A protein has these predicted regions:
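Conserved beta-strand in the GNAT
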Residues: 59, 65-74, 90, 95
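Conserved GNAT-fold acetyl-CoA-binding loop/helix
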Residues: 24-46
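Conserved N-terminal entry element of GNAT/NAT acetyltransferase domains
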Residues: 1-14
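Conserved acetyl-CoA pyrophosphate-binding loop and the N-cap/start of the following alpha-helix
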Residues: 100-112
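Conserved GNAT acetyl-CoA-binding A-motif
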Residues: 110, 117-129
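Conserved catalytic-core motifs of GNAT/GCN5-like acyltransferases
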Residues: 74-80, 84, 126-128, 132, ...
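A short helix-loop-beta-strand connector motif used in the catalytic cores of GNAT acetyltransferases and
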Residues: 45-59
Length: 157
């Protein structure tokens, strides 16, 4: 069957949640039922509010089922010399179901995303690459981001 490439819409929310949970399972391992339920609940609300506004999901569909995704979250913040427009894109959830991997799906989705980000006048798109994804991102033109800052976070839990 032929794969269609498109931007996800609100009617795709259940598939987007399924793909996000599959990505989380692959990246973080199995979650407790309570954690999975909490994530699913947050995702439903998140997609209803943000999809098509500041979150754009590029999807590969086969037989009306999403088999690959790439999320682009737009972050707007005060400009500086590195992002004069104050708008950047963050890539999340580049994921293809196991049986469809190595068919160029992620690459096509990322190319769609890169083109769309340019139309949005983003200063750049950034991501955190897994070892498996790193060669693809390099091939697409992403560069290692040397930064003089140490990445840190403050966790509330």
């Amino acid at each position: 069957m032929e794969i269609q490439y498109l931007q996800a819409v609100l009617s795709d929310i259940d598939d987007l949640i399924r793909m996000r949970l599959a990505y989380i399972h692959d990246d973080f391992g199995p979650q407790t039922p309570d954690t999975e339920k909490a994530i699913e609940s947050q995702l439903k609300d998140y997609f209803r509010i943000h999809l098509g506004k500041d979150c754009f999901v590029f999807a590969a569909k086969e037989n009306e089922t999403i088999v690959g995704t790439a999320f682009l979250v737009i972050v707007e913040k005060p400009a500086n010399p590195h992002f004069l427009h104050g708008k950047i894109g963050e890539v999340l959830n580049v994921y293809t179901v196991p049986e469809k991997r190595r068919q160029g799906i992620a690459g096509k989705l990322m190319k769609m995303m890169i083109e769309y980000g340019q139309k949005l006048d983003l200063d750049f798109i950034e991501l955190k690459a897994t070892e498996a994804g790193y060669p693809l991102y390099k091939k697409l033109g992403f560069e290692d981001s040397p930064c003089g800052y140490k990445e840190m976070k403050y966790a509330y839990t």
